[in-house]
Amino acid sequence: MPPKDGKSAKKKGGISKAEKERLQREEEEKRQREAEEARLIAEREENERLERERIEQEKQHILELKDRERREDELNELRHILDENHFAVTVWEAECREKSKWERYMLCDGSPDPSVQPEINTYISLWRDDSENQIQKVLEECALTLELEKELEFLLGDGPEPSIAEQYQETLLSLQNLIHYKLNQATEELLKFANYNSDIDTGNMQTVVKDSNITLCLWANLNKNPRFKGYKFEEVGLGFELPKPLAVIEVAVRILHTRYDHLSHHSEREQLQKRRSMMEAILTQNTESSAAVHNGKMEGERDESESSKQVDECHSVRSESRKRSAVSVISAKEGRKSSSIKLLEEGESQMEEITTTLEADQHDPYPSPAEPVTDTDVHIVDLQQFTPLGGVFYFDLFHMPPQSRTVKGWEMRELLDTGLQVFPYPTEQSRIQSSTSVKLDEHSNTTVASLPVGVTVALPHSVLFLEDPQVARWDPIGQHWRTDCISETSYDAELRTISFQMTAFYAFTLLQETYANMPFQSWELRPLGQDSALFTITGALIEVSITVKGKQCMLHTEETKDLDRLLGKWMSPSELQKAMRKAGINIFVNEYSDKYVSINLKDPLIEHAVYEQMALMSSAVAFSWSRWNAQCRQEHLVLQACEQLEVGPVAEKAWSLYLLGAQRNQHLKMKEQEDSFSPELAEGSEFHSTFLHMLRQDLSTEGQARVRQSHHLYIDTVQRLLCATRVLTYS
């Protein structure tokens, strides 16, 4: 085949310029078409998004209008329900008080009525002058006196008039002092006859006398053996160790364990007085500053006075209706456009102002804590941070009273009117040497003050220590529990005993952190039937469950050891709280708690309103903790809820999330397990002004019937537990 010419070869070897331009044009046109298509798609998607948003906004607007239209009716209905329940509970409480007074009046057991001043004064005088000092008789009388104290504490809990309350407090203090006085007399009586009751093996006298309230361990040093180191009262798990100088002196050692605590309230009163002094100083400074502002005609005077007036008005409203619900305060004058409704409509600033005012009221169901006084002495125990448990151990050293001697068939005893005398310890070595025939090392400069005394204590069986207990001694001068002068502390968890040394003989107690079981890890309130529910809190250390049935509560916990007196017993909410705190199982908070526990700060008005409505629905609706609650700001709460009519655990898929606020409550589309939070409404759901109506719209007929038939005392009991634990803030 003949070869092609050069032109053909050139064409074959490359693309012509015209061809390149054509291809480029085609490529450019393709890019433009694709870009146009992408633009059109993006524009269409954007239009669709805007349309969806418009539709959503329209739906949102319609729902908001609908919510606004029925807002007044919903708030009024809720207020009416709460007021009815509150009135019924108030009437029942008044009837109970009257019934209790009548039963006390008709009681003919010979015991005085502690509320009647002449009766109780006569009782105190007669017992003080009674010469019967036998220990068993004294313990019996102490038991009666302790019952009278409980009556007085109950009366004080009713909030009597200030003058009456002061009278009750004085009577209470007199009874407490009288008990200790008579126990000292009984101790002296036992020591007078120590030589008759001496132990053959040791040559000393040791005895244990106890009842349900008091354990008295007494040891008298009759043998004065210099090799004596200490003694343990095995039957009660109490023991002591003495330094050698005391082993050769005629002294007596007493360990008096009272299962009640008559000392801590003195420290609480002292701390309260300091707080009041501090507040008075602050108020004085504020007054002086206000006066300076007034005299100087400073700008903003009118605004400040109006703000002060606003706060005073809010405080007045709260004081007059502190037992009513927060929602009642908000909605009581809805139709007259009151400041309570403006609180909901004018945003965060006013809510914070009201909250600040409410925090100052320490008698609220769960006010935010006031600033606790910080003492410069680090050894003083803060009784808000620590709780004395197991009662008080009085560890005392006494002079031995004169013992009887037999002379020519006659028993002779020196009678002294000094009573039981405390042996001063520590004291100078020379003083001890002068009172004994045993000489110590003359070259030693050691004083008895450097020789500590040892104590061993078995932990009380009625108390659950969640952590290793701490020890504090009582300072009678400063009226405080202190942690100094205590050393060599050793705790045996297996034997449940604690040993330590003190520089002197002090009353002491065992301490536990008040909020050791906080913050809560989770919680759940689940119905068990009509007017019955199970409230479970998983704390930082243990899980606690409380069964509610009517107006009664019963505690359950995994830790059952040594809590037989508490577990499985029905009692009122207030009795349960007191018993649980006394047993070391504290899940309750007060006005100082947030100073010691990491919390999710929430608006107290909103929080309290939610607790009220949860209590109303608790016969038919289960509630639970949500991790999203911590992610929301303080004006919003998030929790899980669902209808639960059967007894048993709630199915995981049954739970729904709810976002709650001061003005609006909504059912969320998202579930607890999702990775991110979304406020999108659940399909078919609407906004509601109250949580009650939000839940009620989805309830079955049976569920709604249960809610309507809920007894006011049951509702009050559940509400008290929720307000006392504040699970929405402390978990």
From Swiss-Prot:
UniProt key word Cytoplasm: yes
Feature: compositional bias, Basic and acidic residues: 17-50, 296-320
Superkingdom, taxonomy of origin: Eukaryota
GO cellular component, one term: axoneme
Pfam families assigned: Casc1_C, Casc1_N
Location(s), subcellular: Cell projection, Cilium; Cytoplasm
Region Disordered, annotated ranges: 1-50, 285-320
Function: Via its association with the multisubunit axonemal dynein complex, may be potentially involved in the regulation of cilia function.
The protein's assembly and partners: Part of the multisubunit axonemal dynein complex formed at least of two heavy chains and a number of intermediate and light chains.
Family as reported in the entry's similarity comment: Belongs to the DNAI7 family.
Protein name: Dynein axonemal intermediate chain 7
Primary gene name: dnai7
